[in-house]
Amino acid sequence: MENEALKNILTRHSVREFTAEAVKKDDLLTILRAGMSAPSAVNRQPWSFVAITNREILDALCEKLPFAKMLSKAGAAIVVCGLPDKAKIFNLAVKVVARISLGDFWITDCSAASENILLASHALGYGAVWTAVFPDEKKIKDVREILKIPEDIIPLNVIPIGVPVNKNEPPKDKFKEKNIHWEN
């Protein structure tokens, strides 16, 4: 495939086994830039990111998050957090005009940022995987405590990033024509 963007999308897969090698700071900054390049409703960008390279913090998260055990060997992690209050400023104006509630668009916006983080990690030769925090109240509380995140910020997920143990693992082809419905 010649198109690099499509190749990156179609070959990305969740990686749960890492070599414990460090992730370069410049690479983390590039990955974060990709996350912040995601679309968001009315460009509100209701997100905040916590970049983690400290082994003690990675291990503390690993201990508290049952589906993030791969943090024990990850070289870094990014916690994608939502800023619901930032989205609400826009929501109040739209609610009056459109009579709809857009209060949870921070989830959609942060999810788009998360996908960009996963794709950028893959493009730079790293593996990554989305591990959910939101909407589990205990996980939210634990992540907030470990990272000292204020109450008005909600951790959506923790994305472990690292050098994959198996760099040649092929992705699964997830295309299913039965999931496509045409207009007629």
What are these regions (language model features)?
Residues M1-N184:
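Acidic, surface-exposed loops and disordered segments
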